[in-house]
Amino acid sequence: MQRLAGAIDAFVDLVGRATAWLTLGLALVMGANVLLRYGFSVGSIWMQEFEWHLLVPICVFGMCYALLHGEHVRVDVAFQYFSERNKRRVNVATAILGMALSAIVIKLSLPYVYQSWSINEGTANPGGIEHRYIVKGLIPLGFALYFLQSLSETIKSCFAFRSARDVA
């Protein structure tokens, strides 16, 4: 099981590091969009939509990377005072909750994504980016990766429980 958790962690780390480069691309596109709009009075719907096409993978894959590295949102004000045992309990409970939430989002988003792919959904804006269905397809994909990372966190926390019990 620990090998599975390690493999999941390595994959999520790889995806997260690759996705991080999209942040640079997003900043450049946004900067160019602002420069063109306010410096030259030239608006570009394509560039505005491209920002969303970059932001979606940053968010859906970034949340997995943040969970892996413990940078996700947590109420550290209280958590920092918990014993190690209670921290592990909270980590197991939240990881299981994360898996349940991921499964729900995947189940609810699949018909939405399927419909988008089946009609080859594009933009309604003239001059915008077609292939909106690709971005929508990242929703269940990102939550599947989040499910796997939550599973990895559950495995690691359960092994930490067992190791702590063996020491005591």
Annotate the PLM regions.
Residues 1-168:
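Alpha-helical transmembrane segments and membrane-interface helix-loop junctions
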